[in-house]
């Protein structure tokens, strides 16, 4: 018996991979669990990245049949990974020391990173070192492609995952952003009448993001690819009413040269067309109460009852990313944008709106969410793979202190 790790082939592996996915989704009957439906595409969560790879682990056994020795192969695990270039730090331009009196802003330092996700091992084949083999093989591909750091996200309560990556594979705790989840109600969310919301073109959004957010940790260098992706439903900016009426919008350059006192921005990513989630293990009474709340919300929308959405069958999500803003009323602007995004998700038949922000990011207070559905501390772990660094100003990024904000790539949520 041996384990062979190789690249995923849709033609020969799809059925077996889906079987392993389903077997890994069997949780304790007494507990509520969250399961992912990949809609027939095991690559759906990585295929929009600049470079990606999926590996499968095959268990090869020798069997005897009619006096002949044969090899029997079956897939018992898989892992996914993608590569991109992101911001890992900042520095001042080279001429800053020569002209210290000139007002200059720091510029981003980029590095090539890899993200690991979707590690699955068949329950009957665990504790055989298969997960370590998959991680090691994936890291070989990362290194071959010039990756300097590899990182992943997991739950701090997932002891098996933490033990595998932190104790066996050399990863360490790095960042702990917060995942904020808001149900989509039957009634429309309130959007402040003191706020005007404008939709930007991908090019306009790119200009603002690069000018204002490119020094934020994990900012993707290929932000233009994200904004032009078909899954991106748009970038929206909130300003005080009448400050920048749609008919007077003169473009991002003039906006940035003379911005209003307060403003905020976010983009919406449509996960609904790529994958869906499902809550399993809820009691019959719990499902009944949730259904009753939805009926009441639909019949009496003016009461604005915070109904519990239909999460007990596959449901869609809109992911909000690139949240930010400036000014004393930026939080109010963010709240209005989130209300607008809620109503957009309602139009698209989604049950949940989610985002992920820095744990101590001030913007967090402006994002409506249910604590019971959210995760205050999503654990990100990192490992240094390359000896050569993109810039000497950074040093060893794994030992750096976190900033207030973090840019979460929607392609990896």
Regions found by a protein language model. Give the residues of each.
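Amide-forming acyltransferase catalytic core, primarily the GNAT-like/NAT-type
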Residues: 14-22, 26-54, 111, 166-319
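GNAT/GCN5-related N-acetyltransferase fold signature
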Residues: 57, 81, 121, 266-268
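Glycine-rich acetyl-CoA-binding "A-motif" of GNAT/NAT acetyltransferases
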Residues: 63-64, 71-77, 160, 260-262
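A conserved beta-turn-beta hairpin within the catalytic core of GNAT-like acetyltransferases
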Residues: 85-95, 104-116, 309-320
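Conserved acetyl-CoA-binding loop-helix of GNAT-fold acetyltransferases
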Residues: 121, 127-141, 167, 329-343
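Conserved active-site alpha-helix within GNAT-family acetyltransferase domains
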Residues: 144, 156-178, 359-380
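C-terminal functional modules
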Residues: 342, 348-413
């Amino acid at each position: 018996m041996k384990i062979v790790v190789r690249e995923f082939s849709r033609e020969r592996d799809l059925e077996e991979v889906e079987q392993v996915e389903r077997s890994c989704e069997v949780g304790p009957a007494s507990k509520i669990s969250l399961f992912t439906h990949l809609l027939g595409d095991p690559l759906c969560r990585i295929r929009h990245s600049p470079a990606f790879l999926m590996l499968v682990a095959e268990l090869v056994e020798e069997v005897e049949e009619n006096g002949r020795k044969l090899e029997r192969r079956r897939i018992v695990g898989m892992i996914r990974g993608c590569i991109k270039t992101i911001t890992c730090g900042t520095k001042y331009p080279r001429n800053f020391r020569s002209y210290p009196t000139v007002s200059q802003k720091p510029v981003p330092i980029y590095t090539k990173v890899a993200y690991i996700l979707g590690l699955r091992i068949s329950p009957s084949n665990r504790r055989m070192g298969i997960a370590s083999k998959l991680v090691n093989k994936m890291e070989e591909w990362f290194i071959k492609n010039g990756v300097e750091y590899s990182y992943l996200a997991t739950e701090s309560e997932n002891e098996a995952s933490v033990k595998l990556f932190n104790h066996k594979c050399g990863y360490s705790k790095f960042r702990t952003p917060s995942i904020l989840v808001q149900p989509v109600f039957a009634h429309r969310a309130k959007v402040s009448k003191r706020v005007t919301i404008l939709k930007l073109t991908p090019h306009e959004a790119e200009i603002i993001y690069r000018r204002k957010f490119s020094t934020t940790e994990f900012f993707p260098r290929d932000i233009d690819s994200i904004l032009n992706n078909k899954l991106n439903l748009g970038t929206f900016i909130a300003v005080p009413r009448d400050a920048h009426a749609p008919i007077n919008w003169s473009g991002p350059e003039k906006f940035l040269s003379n911005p209003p006192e307060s403003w905020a921005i976010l983009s919406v990513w449509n996960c609904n067309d790529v994958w869906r989630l499902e809550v399993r293990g809820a009691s019959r009474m719990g499902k009944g109460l949730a259904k009753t709340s939805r009926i009441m919300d639909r019949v009496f929308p003016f009461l604005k009852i915070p109904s519990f959405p239909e999460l007990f069958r596959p449901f869609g999500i809109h992911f909000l990313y690139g949240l930010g803003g400036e000014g004393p009323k930026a939080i109010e602007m963010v709240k209005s944008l989130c209300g607008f995004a809620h109503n957009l998700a309602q139009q698209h038949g989604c049950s949940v709106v989610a985002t992920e922000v820095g744990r101590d990011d001030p913007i967090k207070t402006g994002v409506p969410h249910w604590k019971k559905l959210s995760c205050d501390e999503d654990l990100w772990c990192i490992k240094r793979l390359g000896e050569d660094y993109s810039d000497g100003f950074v040093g060893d990024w794994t030992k750096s202190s976190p900033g207030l904000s973090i840019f979460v790539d929607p392609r990896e949520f």
